[in-house]
Amino acid sequence: MVSVFTYIARMPRVFCDRDEKAGKEFPMRELKTTEAVGKTLCQDITQIIKGEKKGPVFRKGHVIREEDVPVLLSVGKDHIYIWEEGEDTLHENDAAAMLYEMGRSENMHPSEVKEGKIEFIADCDGMLKIQSEKLFALNSFGQMMMATKKNHSFIKKGEAFAGTRIIPLSIEREKMEEVKKIAPEGGILQLLPFEKKKVGLISTGNEVFYKRIQDSFTPVVREKLSPYPVEVIGHVTCPDDVEQEKGAIQDFLRQGADLVICMGGMSVDPDDRTPLAIRLSTEEVVSYGAPVLPGSMFMLAYAKGKVPVLGLPGSIMFCPTTVFDLVLPRIMAGDIVKKEEIDALGEGGLL
């Protein structure tokens, strides 16, 4: 893991003007821009040109020159802050570094500090897992923030999946030491690498088995698996027969499959046998049914050795985003899914 302090070791510190609640003066001064030549900027100065640019025109630590004054005035900075050192406060860069340390774990590194913000960058493809209570506690602490992609998201290598900063230009050192107690060892955010998995695919239904219709389900599932490190070790088609479906599941498990996916036959129709076949082939049924549309007839079970066996309803092949897309990153990262976590998908589950 790369420590963010590597990136800011040479950066000078900046401090807030005043903490209104505490009534404390911080060693930072406001000056007219026209009087600030030779002084040091205590914050990045952002320039926004519609359709062209949004970014710092001057960085923290820049010593203002005579020719810089018109540029500062053009971006609306008639007054600026200059800094002086202090012992009881932390510059926003240093505070952001501390927040990053609270969030970080393996498989990630910090971005360069920019405008007081540090981003979390993925070192590999993986699934983001968040300690939500700790994240909430941090964001409730006041004067600081950490924003993330959604929990259990698919994250690509090189992607920024979170960002953190304090809100003011500086903050009391004591307050930052206090917030560190939420996660003294870090780890609010985890990036679980995707595991290489052997996958068995089972198509079900008389209409497919007897070739009355073309199988349009399997290509969709293969496409959804394609971003992950998988090896499809086989694909079989079964009629609507419990024993044949159960036998196909067990055959794949004996072959060492790390994941078995059953496609179709998941409704309450009299011909649909897949839920029973999954029950008879596994040790634990987590859920038959999920509060998600499309995909409410989804089934998740675990066979011996915590091998997931999925039952996918027909809506998976027609809709671009379904319950399968919500659960698949967790399955591929080896993250065990619990019933209460399936139940919680109802909030935001209308896709």
Show which residues each predicted segment covers.
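Intrinsic-disorder-associated, low-complexity terminal segments enriched in Asp/Asn/His/Tyr and depleted
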Residues: 7, 17-19
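Solvent-exposed alpha-helices and their adjacent loops that cap or buttress functional pockets
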Residues: 34-38, 56, 110-113, 153-155, ...
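Extended, charged alpha/beta regions that create polyanion-binding interfaces
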Residues: 86-194
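Glycine-rich phosphate/diphosphate-binding loop of Rossmann-like nucleotide-binding domains
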Residues: 186-240
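Short glycine/threonine-rich loop/turn motifs
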Residues: 206, 233-351
